Amino acid sequence: MECKRARAYSSSANLGSGFDILSMAHTAFFDTVEICVETKNSENIVIESNSKIPLEPNRNSATYPLVRIMEERGIKASLRVKVIKGIPEGLGLGSSGASATAAVMAFSSLFNLNLSKEDLVRYAMYGEIASSGSPHPDNVAASVFGGVVSVVSVNPVKVVEIPLNYSFNILLFVPLNIHIEEKTKKAREMVPKTVKLSDYINNSRYISSLLIGFVKGERDLIRLGLNDEIVEKARLPLFPYYPKIKEIAIKYDAVGSCVSGAGPSILVLTDKMTDENKIAEEGTKTCNEFNVECEVIKAKIAGGVEVERRN
């Protein structure tokens, strides 16, 4: 029985005002997906996992992309798919996107499809449909490419890797006792359909500030760019502790802070000028004030999805 296994890292989408556009892959967590071909003359997908994920192929973020690839490319096979979840689910860390990305990469390797990175993103987006009903591309793009990415087009898929000329580390405040059913779907429903022109202009300025800050290595521009007037504000009921954590992060000279994806996790960028211990200590106290138990995770920028070698 031939098998392939791939690993994809967690990610933080939006990065302030870059809703459905920007995302960052990091080493905080990763998912692994192993796909084995049992027979090539029938069509069946059996799912195994260490987590309570849907076992129906069309409802599973790892296997629904495979269903679509097989339909589109006329591939017939009976598959056993093992999804090893390392990324906490429903916490704004790209869990479904990483599973989808790892699955598509393993499948591409198994069937020698040699899919381009953009095709990996395009197929992995089906995993987001299975998870939340929306094919948002930002998390899967980060998990595919690694680093910081901008999704500049979805039809066709076009992703640009953002050059990083400023060295920073990552702190994540990850709530352990928050669980919201269909969180991503609900969070997307909270995003306003219309916005004030002044908010739109400010958000456009933030995006340009962040990207220029990354490219030119300018700390102040990165800090300014990690702000948002629209989406974070609309979703604040999901993470009421966020404004104070951000205030603490800036107080102790973090590069900047924002909500990780749809939350409730919070992303803080740090460097040699930052007092990480104070941010972790006071940020954890803030979580507790809101009856939220937060784990603080230290991470770095991650690379893209990879096929794991078998010993």
Swiss-Prot record:
PROSITE patterns membership: GHMP_KINASES_ATP
Top-level division of the source organism's lineage: Archaea
Pfam families to which the protein is assigned, alphabetical: GHMP_kinases_C, GHMP_kinases_N
UniProt keyword ATP-binding present: yes
Subcellular location: Cytoplasm
PANTHER family listed in its UniProt record: HOMOSERINE KINASE, HOMOSERINE/4-DIPHOSPHOCYTIDYL-2-C-METHYL-D-ERYTHRITOL KINASE
Name of the protein described by the UniProt record: Homoserine kinase
Lineage of source species: Archaea, Thermoproteota, Thermoprotei, Sulfolobales, Sulfolobaceae
